[in-house]
Structures are given as structure tokens and as C-alpha cells.
Amino acid sequence: MKKLLLWGLPLLCLAAGCREQTDETPDERSIAYNDRAIALMQDYLERDEVLPDSSLLAACRTRTDTIQRVMKDIVDSCQTLLDSALLYSPEHYFYYAQKATLYACGAYYQEAARWMEKALKKKDLPELRLGAGMFLQKAGEEQQAHTRYRHVADQYRTRDTLSSADRINYAFALILSGEKEMARRTIDSLITDTLARKQLLQMTENPQEALNALFP
């Protein structure tokens, strides 16, 4: 079974959206390498006694240099496994997105953005573009990030139907683009889940803080 290691409400929906869009089955060996990469990262995080919630990556700020070096080794090992996954499924966007996500786990945001852009070249999905925007913003490329967010919102706006994951990603893209009032109207009209609605409305007050809660 494929797994995508993402935390936080919008990112969980990003993962769900990507899985829904899968239109071809990857090689079984790719699936196995991917699962090994995720298991390796999860095992490290569990040993590090960091809970897998929206505060997980923010805890990286207080880690010692030793812990950061260990984290780099873990990220590098995960990337090697995902390189093997891509060897057997080179046209499958999912593994490019996985590499981006696991680079982000180690706060390597330029690499994360680069690999998410590669995923976009394989399949043009708003979920992937949202991820690219977030990683670009964390890398300090705010203008490029906002261009991605506006494009994401336009893509969702033109869809005839939106899944629950689509609606949350749509609202989050508007939040990150700074369109506070439009984001609030979209949340009011599209988000029915009480918890998701509450979290997203809170995020409209400070988009950068919301992003920093997901990534250090």
C-alpha cells in the first residue's frame, strides 16, 4: 500500500487528493521501496519521541546539532530508497512528490520545491502545485509561492465538482495567497466539517504562522 508522510490538516488533504488522482499502478518494487522509506522516517520520529501532529516539524527548531545531523542521515537514506522507487516507476509523479515531502521533513525546502516541480511536470495537479508553493515560501521565494497559490485557486475554481480534500486545499491556497476575505467566504460556503472549518478560519488570521506550524 502506498503511503505519503504528511502532517497537518491541509497536507493530509493534499495527500488524499494525490492518491485519488492516481491513474496507473506503479511497479510493486516501487511500492516496496516507498514503504521502506516511510517506515524509516516514522521509526526515527517515534524514537525521537516527537508526536506526528502539526507541531512535529516545528520541534526541529530546538533540536541540537547532533540531532540535526542524524536527521540529515535519515533523510538521505530515505531519498536513496525513493531513488530506487523511481528507477522502477520513472514516470509516476507520486514518487517525485514523496521525495519532495521527505526533503521537507528535514527542512531542505529548496530541494523539496525542486522535486515537487518535477512531480508537476509528470502530472499537473493543484495538490502538487500547492505543495510546491509552500516549499517555495519556506525557501524564501514568496513571490513565486504566491503565483503558485493563485494558480491552485484558479484550478479548483474551474472544477465542476470538488471533493472534501479539494475544498480544504482550495481554501488553504486562498489563505496562503493572502486573500483573507475570499478565503473566509470560501470556507463559509464549502467547508462543512466543524473541526476543519474552525482550523481554517483560525489560519486566515496569520497565514505565515499557519505555514510555520506545519514546517519549521
Label each PLM-derived region with a short phrase.
Residues P90, K123-D124, R157, T161, ...:
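Short coil turns that delineate tetratricopeptide repeat
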Residues C18-D76, T80:
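N-terminal leader/linker segments that initiate helical-solenoid repeat arrays
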Residues F172-P216:
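Terminal, low-structured helical/coil segments at or just beyond the last alpha-helical repeat
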Residues Q98, G131, N169, M203-N206:
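Canonical tetratricopeptide repeat
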